[in-house]
Amino acid sequence: MDAHPDCGACAPKLHSWYDSDRFEYAGAAGGRIDRWGYPFCRGRRLSRTEEDHGQYDTPADVFWATGACLMTRSVLWRRLGGLDSRFFAHMEEIDYCWKLQLDGYKVCCVPQSVVYHLGGGTLPKTSPWKLKLNFRNGLLLLENNLARTFAAQGEPPRKALRHANRVIFWRKCLDGCSAAVYLLSGRKDFFKAVLEAHREARNLVSRPDIEALACQAKTSGVAGRYGGSIILASLLKGKRVFDYIESKMVL
């Protein structure tokens, strides 16, 4: 951090406590995000994690750094208000890292450091509440930051807001498809969790207004955004997905 004043936050590689040679779901080798706001990681595609063979041992700018072990500058933490309390337990570090980038700072993965993480300690993967938080907070993430990102890239405020609204609409449609799959497969508790997530998100949303977008500082880009769908890319490219995605990153 001392050697790189433009770095606002950094994190190590995250390995599984149970399988020490394998990346851990909550951060792996640094986080990315796709066009629709679905987060993923280098070393993690969908729910599958890779073994660490040194394939991500070069320090890299990433979109988000894991909240399991995050170092950030105290002055930036105070200025940005820390973690958004509306998120609770899921994706709040992604929201914070996105704000850091919009403030002109980088987020980095430092693979020379490795931390072993006990995943699922707060909520198990099978919890409908966990699923609800993931879907709800995914929408909050986009509402908080997407219009600001388009404004930072030079779009006029009203155009940036319309652009963000279109993306969020399609994200909601994709969530609806997931809900339908849960219902048809008999997982009614998961189906209800998605519906509840969208209902809660509507009540929690606080969008930036036109004046705030007009004041948004322009940036050279937000690192770690993939312009396509991580779900589609993973299905089509399999184990080669990260080589493909790295060539398609948008700034």
Feature locations, PLM:
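Short helix-loop capping/hinge motifs at secondary-structure junctions, enriched
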Residues: E50, L76-R79, A147-T149
